From Swiss-Prot:
HAMAP family: GatC (MF_00122). Belongs to the GatC family. The keyword Transcription regulation does not apply. It is an enzyme of class 6 (ligase). Its EC number is 6.3.5.-. InterPro entries: Asp/Glu-ADT_sf_sub_c (IPR036113), GatC (IPR003837). Disulfide bonds: none annotated. This is Glutamyl-tRNA(Gln) amidotransferase subunit C, mitochondrial. Keywords: ATP-binding, Ligase, Mitochondrion, Nucleotide-binding, Protein biosynthesis. It catalyses: L-glutamyl-tRNA(Gln) + L-glutamine + ATP + H2O = L-glutaminyl-tRNA(Gln) + L-glutamate + ADP + phosphate + H(+). It comes from the Eukaryota.
Length: 173
């Protein structure tokens, strides 16, 4: 390890290693940093993750893939004032400004584009870890009818429902 010191998955340049190791020349620095427990890589601008060497084969493309989203101008959704008032009341977000309405419209258009993407012949994703098998268990009921025991765990219940504290103070209309 003469020019680069490697600690876990971090690769540091020689200058950073010198600062940490307090060594004056490369030979001393290399001796200092041979043991990972002696070398702690600081998190700074010179430390970078090394993504060039992958441990496992991956299905994720290594270069960006251009995806053409279908144009949905024909299906453009118009939001009336009543719907905006309902959204304000449910989300507790004030949508009075033009910028807020523009953001809402662009979000709806983006969601509409995603909804129209062709996903035929795409296998469902069960786990984000490609190199590990996810063991799915059979959906069998082992302990049934434990509703009363589960409701005892809640501080406040109403009939057969949990009562949660309000997250925000509602807007005054």
């Amino acid at each position: 390890m003469n020019k680069n010191c490697i600690s876990a998955s971090w690769r540091c340049d020689e200058r950073t290693a010198r600062q940490v190791c307090s060594a004056d020349d490369s030979d001393k620095m290399a001796d200092c940093c041979k043991r990972p427990e002696d070398f702690q890589c600081p998190i700074n601008k010179t430390a970078k993750l090394d993504f060039k060497e992958l441990r496992y084969a991956t299905k994720v493309p290594q270069t960006p893939v251009d995806t053409v989203f279908p144009e949905t101008t024909a299906n453009r959704v118009e939001i009336d004032a009543k719907t905006i008032q309902l959204l304000e009341r449910l989300s507790l977000v004030n949508l009075d400004s033009e910028q807020a309405l523009a953001t809402l419209n662009s979000s709806i258009q983006f969601a509409d584009k995603i909804a129209h993407i062709n996903t035929e012949n795409v296998r469902p994703l069960y786990t984000v870890l490609e190199n590990q098998q996810l063991q799915l268990r059979n959906d069998e009921v082992k302990e049934g009818d434990c509703r009363v025991e589960l409701l005892r765990n809640a501080k406040v219940t109403d009939e057969d429902y949990y009562v949660s504290p309000p997250g925000n103070i509602p807007l005054e209309q």
